[in-house]
Swiss-Prot record:
Belongs to the bacterial ribosomal protein bL35 family. The keyword Ribosomal protein applies. HAMAP family: Ribosomal_bL35 (MF_00514). Residues 21-40 are annotated as: Disordered. Keywords: Ribonucleoprotein, Ribosomal protein. The keyword Ribonucleoprotein applies. Residues 28-40 have a biased composition (Basic residues). This is Large ribosomal subunit protein bL35. GO terms for cellular component: cytosolic large ribosomal subunit.
Length: 66
């Protein structure tokens, strides 16, 4: 059986934590930030843990992650 390929787009956007959760950066930060409050801008600086139902799909595209 041939090796499975990792999706390059998923590899760039997501990472796997030591416990197996999927971590990504917050979305919706590219433009239009003047309308938002300082608190919402500050919160979006960090990372987000994906919902387990969505992370199952992402894990299919990353066959050799932990």
């Amino acid at each position: 059986m041939p090796k499975l390929k990792t999706k390059s787009s998923v590899k760039k956007r997501f990472s796997v934590t030591a416990t197996g959760k999927i971590k990504s950066t917050q979305s919706a930060k590219r433009h239009g930030m003047t309308k938002r409050s300082k608190r919402s801008i500050r919160v979006q600086r960090g990372t987000a843990i994906m919902n387990p139902s969505d992370s199952r799909i992402v894990k299919l595209f990353m066959p050799y992650s932990r």
